[in-house]
């Protein structure tokens, strides 16, 4: 893949950087794996806003992605790589030897026509899914389960991966891209390699309208609101916050740690780096 910097012929194109999709499938998605997606625009059943900055956007179908990879021992051939509007990663349509087709997260360097397989006896090759107990220490992995059989939850977005550091008893230590080291059960599954579309971070939208296509509405600063609307609001002319920065509900922001999950605290060996 490559990036394209558009010429500044219009204000909207000035500074825009796109990622090429020449290698992706040009047609529609695989119909049996498409589901309708109804937009709620951040409103509840009463029409009240429950999540700000949501609404509008282009209609699109949801692609049903196989995050569990439970068809063990059955080889699958990669038929095509597709764009998925619901996520930053690309997806691959694979056809199993028994004729079933599924979508998976496309790893980097996975080519059309390649063969992948799942299960404890699968070889260590890009795109194959195995229990962590069978993956060599030091391997680069993605689509990692946190609960046995629950499906991948970690390292699913474009260009992400994790590193298997060690195995101790029934747990393995995995280092995330953030620097956090976490314990994962060795029976949880992971896929070899890293997620494709690593150039996604180089993309520049160029104009506000692209955000609206994505269903993201503008964010208004609190200091330009009235006191009734935000703790930072009010004042004559241009005034600052007059206090430490908070969100509309008065909770500290800008670095204040809000994580409070004692249930999984013991699974974190080292917190993420700032």
From Swiss-Prot:
The gene is rplB. GO terms for molecular function: rRNA binding; structural constituent of ribosome; transferase activity. Residues 35-60, 224-274 are annotated as: Disordered. Keywords: Ribonucleoprotein, Ribosomal protein, RNA-binding, rRNA-binding. This is Large ribosomal subunit protein uL2. Part of the 50S ribosomal subunit. Forms a bridge to the 30S subunit in the 70S ribosome. The keyword rRNA-binding applies. One of the primary rRNA binding proteins. Required for association of the 30S and 50S subunits to form the 70S ribosome, for tRNA binding and peptide bond formation. It has been suggested to have peptidyltransferase activity; this is somewhat controversial. Makes several contacts with the 16S rRNA in the 70S ribosome. It comes from Delftia acidovorans (strain DSM 14801 / SPH-1). PROSITE patterns: RIBOSOMAL_L2. Residues 50-60 have a biased composition (Basic residues). Belongs to the universal ribosomal protein uL2 family.
């Amino acid at each position: 893949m490559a990036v394209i910097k558009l010429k500044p012929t219009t204000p909207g194109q000035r500074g825009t950087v796109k990622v090429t999709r020449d290698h992706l499938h040009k047609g529609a998605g695989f119909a049996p794996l498409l589901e309708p997606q109804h937009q709620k625009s951040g409103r509840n059943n009463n029409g009240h806003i429950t999540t700000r900055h949501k609404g509008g956007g282009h209609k699109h179908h949801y692609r049903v992605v196989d995050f569990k990879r439970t068809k063990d021992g059955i080889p699958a051939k990669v038929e095509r790589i597709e764009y998925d509007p619901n996520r930053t990663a690309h997806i691959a349509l694979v056809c199993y030897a028994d004729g079933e087709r599924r979508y998976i997260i496309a790893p980097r360097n996975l080519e059309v026509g390649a063969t992948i397989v799942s299960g404890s006896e699968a070889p260590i090759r890009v795109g194959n899914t195995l229990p962590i107990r069978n993956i060599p220490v030091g391997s680069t992995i993605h689509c990692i389960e946190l609960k046995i059989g629950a499906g991948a939850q970690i390292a699913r977005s474009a260009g992400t991966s994790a590193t298997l550091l060690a195995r101790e008893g029934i747990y393995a230590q995995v280092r995330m891209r953030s620097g956090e080291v976490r314990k994962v059960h060795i029976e949880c599954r992971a896929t070899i390699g890293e997620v494709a579309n690593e150039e996604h971070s180089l993309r520049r939208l160029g104009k506000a309208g692209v955000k609206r296509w994505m269903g993201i509405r503008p964010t208004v600063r609190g200091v330009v609101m009235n006191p009734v609307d935000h703790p930072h609001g009010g004042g004559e002319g241009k005034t600052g916050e007059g206090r430490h920065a908070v969100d509309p509900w008065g909770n500290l922001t800008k670095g204040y740690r809000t994580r409070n999950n004692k249930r999984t605290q013991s699974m974190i060996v080292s917190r993420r780096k700032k």
